[in-house]
């Protein structure tokens, strides 16, 4: 039942992202903060989404190099810019976690980055689904290799984490990495939780070109 609820939360969230595009909210000359505010209004007014389980992220230009804990200065979307949006809506008490990249313009390098990070997500998903046992650290290293295979650097500290009914499971030790896809988490991702239930993982990819100061992002439920 949990997987079905999570898939429903993701489905609603994907429709939400489509509405962001259909309403032409992503345009040059708009600040990240303004776009974030408009996204929140759309979530509430169109989809009845009031709560998000993690901070709402809109990052453009060089801010796309920032990792989740960072809080870079507000930036204005420019012509031929790249940006990504990372949202964690709560839908009927279940968590979604969706990230998408957008390119304002036709810059070929940025379009390649957008396409490569999305294609890599599905390649990794297909590989993951063939496994019956897998350390989180092994998936992280596989994601790093996929980034390098496409000519990018892997920009994130993690390559994912668990989700569930809000609030999702937390480790007994707040400093533990056991519920993150992290290079130092050598636990099997297929292990059940403390109650014997299946864990559900988000795969998040951030590919970057540090020299050109651009990053691409794609995230959703494995």
Regions found by a protein language model. Give the residues of each.
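Active-site neighborhoods and metal-handling regions in enzymes and metal-associated proteins
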Residues: 1-222
């Amino acid at each position: 039942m949990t997987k079905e609820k999570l898939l429903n939360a993701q489905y609603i969230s994907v429709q939400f992202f489509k509405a962001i595009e259909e309403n032409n909210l992503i345009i040059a000359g708009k600040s990240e903060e303004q776009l974030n505010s408009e996204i929140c209004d759309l979530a509430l007014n169109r989809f009845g989404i009031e709560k998000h389980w993690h901070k709402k992220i809109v990052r453009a230009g060089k801010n796309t190099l920032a990792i989740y804990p960072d809080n870079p200065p507000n930036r204005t979307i420019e012509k031929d810019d790249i940006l990504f949006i990372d949202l964690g809506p709560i839908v009927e008490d279940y968590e979604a976690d969706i990230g998408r990249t957008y390119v304002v313009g036709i810059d070929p390098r940025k379009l390649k980055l957008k396409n490569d990070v999305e294609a890599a997500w599905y390649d990794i998903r297909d590989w993951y689904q063939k496994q019956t046992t897998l350390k989180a650290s092994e998936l992280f290293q596989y994601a790093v290799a996929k980034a390098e295979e496409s000519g990018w650097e892997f920009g994130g500290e993690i390559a994912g984490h668990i989700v569930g009914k809000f609030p999702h499971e937390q480790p007994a030790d707040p400093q533990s990495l056991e519920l993150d896809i992290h290079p130092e988490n050598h636990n099997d991702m297929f292990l059940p939780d403390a109650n014997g239930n299946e864990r559900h993982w988000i795969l998040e990819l951030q590919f970057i070109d540090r020299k050109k100061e651009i990053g691409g992002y794609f995230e959703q439920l494995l």
